[in-house]
């Protein structure tokens, strides 16, 4: 059903890490609801897709019955593109962009075969230079890459040529943009200039505020962010996973509406009393099955889950065509197929029906050992 690609990390002689990418393609319940306005610009209506997940349910499918193909892309390693830690990945039609925030503080461009092409931008204070990277985005026409650097947007073409620098009228931890149409900014603590401390702000191309939604969950005892980037771009659409919920919203210029709601039997994020601190709450969350990451493709949406003690990341696939949900049980019968876990780097679309997950060098070597020792391989000799 789905194709999947992997970036694997290979050790160089100086023990720096380069990356390898894994590609998957094709994945696999929608309940109509009365239209309800949950905020001035937030809509829940009949387009809401409710996905019911029972972690202990009997009906499930082998990994290799859900994934059509797996391939691996080994990224080139040389002194010009040493990657210490992958913070974010983006894919255009021609290139794979890797952002390393914490070690290299750089964005590297590779072709689809893993060959290093160029670096995008550089550290500095001049035009087209940045101090500390936060996020990168592709314009929806895939003609420009935008680096977000502590309240500055640096625009480049895909050949690395600097186009312009823009200083927005707001500060955010996370951003996404749709060409010159609108920009979404998000900060968990709430916008500084907003008395209601709402987390999401949507602006037009001139940074004029269009609307704000989602009041901050921060208080005196709880100020813990919910992991990865809340704002994500899949295709030409922007999505927001509301922190500490399983609700995913599609963000548009004049409104946002709830697109997916994940209902987990005996799981999910529990309600949090106002006086509960971050440490106590995260311990409780660890005992529950909860959503870890997701990716939205053209025909499918895939949702990964996590819980303390899990040795792999279970997932379900929702088919937009059949409107059915398929749960993976982690088993496989093809020794070349493995149920890879997404780790701490957000999953990204490689193309319309393929998603990409980075894998460490040690993981790739362990997979090779499993293949060589697999009874499915040895029994066929």
Predicted regions and their residues:
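Blade/loop signatures of beta-propeller domains
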Residues: 34-74
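Blade-loop segments of beta-propeller domains
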Residues: 76-86, 106-108, 115-142
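Short coil/turn segments at the loop-to-beta-strand junctions that recur within blades
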Residues: 79, 121-129, 167-173, 216-221, ...
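Short beta-strand elements that form the blades of beta-propeller/WD-repeat-like
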Residues: 50, 95-101, 143-149, 181-192, ...
